[in-house]
Amino acid sequence: SVEDSPVGAKVVCKDKSGNTVSFEAEKVLVAIGRRANTAALDLAAGKIHNDKGRILVNDKMETSVPGVYAIGDCVFGHAQLAHTASAMGEVAAENICGHEAHYCEKTNPTCVYMEPEAASVGLTEEQCKAQGIAYKVGKFPMSANGKALILNGGEGLVKIIAGAEYGEILGMHIIGPRATDLIAEGALAIGGEMTLDELIDTIHSHPTVTETMREAALNAEKRAIHTKN
């Protein structure tokens, strides 16, 4: 629930353990999603499969009707972000022109442009558990990174999820300064099937926030240098 408070608003909710917790803020953002603007297309008449107006496509961005493609916010099951739509558009255009192209969701970052920034790509721990994937986790706090502190960004962390046996990078999740820039390294690592060792062996310039990526990989391998394992 949301209540008035001297600060502005008070949000009362329950945590994972069922305990009642509250937060106060000047403003409350209600983010409940958006409807696809497809009503005028009369998808049913075109026999284009959809879910409440969100169009179903394959990895070529082709709909249930051969030769008809859809991209962006009207597509079902994908983040409504500009770079997502752009990547989909390139894939659709390549296939329309007779080339072979496929959209890869696992390398598509989701980003939240706030303060601090947040970004994520690949699998989460919950998804690994649901899929029966054995994994290990590495973390590194922004508070232990010099450049992050210079940018007044000591809050947050980098979290890397990797396969337990071979160390292949499965997911990366970041909260902190320049997270929406840093996440591209995670997408590259996943797309290139890089391992923790390969990320560790890559020299990251100093002082930069990118060092947190390597430090998180070191932590996953129990080889941390600037934090505890």
Which residues does each PLM region occupy?
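A conserved short coil-to-beta-strand element within the FAD-binding core of flavoproteins
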Residues: S1-G8
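Short gly/ser/thr-rich secondary-structure transition/capping motifs
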Residues: G8-K14, I48-L56, S143
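Flexible, glycine-rich terminal cap/loop adjacent to redox cofactors
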Residues: C97, M114-T124, K129-N229
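Internal hydrophobic alpha-helix adjacent to the cofactor/substrate pocket in enzyme cavities
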Residues: H83-K106, I133-A134, G192-L196
